[in-house]
């Protein structure tokens, strides 16, 4: 009897969470037209590309491996860079606290329309103990992986701003592709910058 009651309660919990639009933490409702993408990267098997690929799949985005496809959007990873700077020092002048910064640049290419730039900055700080060099390196590597995962999450979220800008451009040009509208006016298409998207470059700080 008790087992049946527990089963019933679990079933009700599932129905309630499904009915209220419950989503897994960290997931984004990616627009339908961006749920199928090409993913381009100069290092497709590197740790950043793997993190981005994983986040796309977690958000129900299908990654198409056919690079010849020209009818679906492309998420292109332009590049990434890491830097480290000293935040505080000990009395003897040795670094006590460091800050890691991960900068990622990407863009979304919509076939027949425009190119939308994306930018992410992720920050992490950690204490530098000169007596535990090996532990310090291990901690830094863990932080770098967490930063890559967070950057990937932020890139996926920025797909929402791409969708909003695309809808705005389509309405502005009378439901015509941006490139066609610009051609009719005798001008070349220009890339949409961060301010046009209505959202500045994402900068996430977590300590």
Swiss-Prot record:
Lipid-attached positions, N-palmitoyl cysteine: 20
UniProt signal peptide: 1-19
UniProt keywords, alphabetically: Cell outer membrane, Lipoprotein, Membrane, Palmitate, Signal
Molecular-function GO terms, alphabetical: lipopolysaccharide binding
Lipid modification (S-diacylglycerol cysteine), residues: 20
Biased composition (Polar residues): 182-207
Gene3D superfamilies: Lipoprotein like domain
Keyword Cell membrane annotated: no
Subcellular location: Cell outer membrane
Annotated stretches, region: Disordered: 168-207
GO cellular component: cell outer membrane; transporter complex
Recorded topology in the membrane: Lipid-anchor
Keyword Metal-binding among record annotations: no
GO-annotated biological processes: Gram-negative-bacterium-type cell outer membrane assembly; lipopolysaccharide transport
Family listed: Belongs to the LptE lipoprotein family.
HAMAP family, alphabetized: LPS_assembly_LptE
Subunit text: Component of the lipopolysaccharide transport and assembly complex. Interacts with LptD.
Role noted for this protein: Together with LptD, is involved in the assembly of lipopolysaccharide (LPS) at the surface of the outer membrane. Required for the proper assembly of LptD. Binds LPS and may serve as the LPS recognition site at the outer membrane.
Family matches, as NCBIfam families: PRK10796.1 (NF008062)
Protein name (record): LPS-assembly lipoprotein LptE
Species: Yersinia pestis
Lineage: Bacteria, Pseudomonadati, Pseudomonadota, Gammaproteobacteria, Enterobacterales
